[in-house]
Amino acid sequence: MEEGLIDRLLETLWLDRRLSQNTLNGYRRDLEKIARRLSQSGRMLKDADEADLAAAVYVDGEQRSSQARALSACKRLYIWMEREGIRTDNPTRLLKPPKIDKNIPTLITEQQISRLLAAPDTDTPHGLRDKALLELMYATGLRVSEAVGLNFGNVDLDRGCITALGKGDKQRMVPMGQESAYWVERYYTEARPLLLKGRNCDALFVSQKKTGISRQLAWMIVKEYASQAGIGHISPHSLRHAFATHLVRHGLDLRVVQDMLGHADLNTTQIYTHVANVWLQGVVKEHHSRN
């Protein structure tokens, strides 16, 4: 019964909202977790009340972000159940997500980015691929899943832009800049054929297995060159943070940055204003004569 409800909800979300498979899998994990906790008290998703759900969601010792995510999944479920006539009420209506302290992204400086981008050996096919990948990710602010999911058809070198497929399969066009376009074109014409060795592959960035690179490989590439450049605590998402923060610092309108990042809500983008301000405060503290 519980699995059936979850399956029906996820099918509806996929059909109506075109949510990505990763998002749907996340909803499934959270709802199955809540269903297991309810079953320990002899209750089910279908008949749980507000108190049951509060006890299942707000578990001592669990991260608040996990609680908030589980509550969000529950709210979607009960809105759908009420709409479908499975229930006549929504027991999550008054439940509030726990307050979460915003994690300010660690800022990578432009000097560190320069060292990172200079690290790959572009005289080798793998190094040229890695150089193109790093340049593109920093130039566009792509999520790692968007970068590894690119086909060459998504890249318009003449216009200097790419078409990214973001969350919910939403497309957006992002300028890639001359430097990034140069390295992507060099990789595509010089290194990619050597990596594929005659095989056909739609993916822009390919591995020695002659298939598109995975998110895990992209993560390893970033970590490897960050280590070579003497930069710690960096991930592919750090390049996205750096892209946004550096644009805001140089005065680009926040709504333009929002569009380039593919954020649905401007509030999500505003964190980069704070990061840029923190950087500015540090510069003043270091260089002002009164500090």
Swiss-Prot record:
One of its GO terms (cellular component) is Holliday junction resolvase complex. The active site is at R143, K167, H237, R240, H263, Y272. Its main location: cytoplasm. Forms a cyclic heterotetrameric complex composed of two molecules of XerC and two molecules of XerD. Keywords: Cell cycle, Cell division, Chromosome partition, Cytoplasm, DNA integration, DNA recombination, DNA-binding. Site-specific tyrosine recombinase, which acts by catalyzing the cutting and rejoining of the recombining DNA molecules. The XerC-XerD complex is essential to convert dimers of the bacterial chromosome into monomers to permit their segregation at cell division. It also contributes to the segregational stability of plasmids. Residues 1-82 form the Core-binding (CB) domain. This is Tyrosine recombinase XerD. Belongs to the 'phage' integrase family. XerD subfamily. GO terms for molecular function: DNA binding; tyrosine-based site-specific recombinase activity. CDD domains: INT_XerDC_C. It is found in: Cytoplasm. GO terms for biological process: cell division; chromosome segregation; DNA recombination; DNA transposition; resolution of DNA recombination intermediates. Residues 103-285 form the Tyr recombinase domain. HAMAP family: Recomb_XerC_XerD, Recomb_XerD. The gene is xerD.
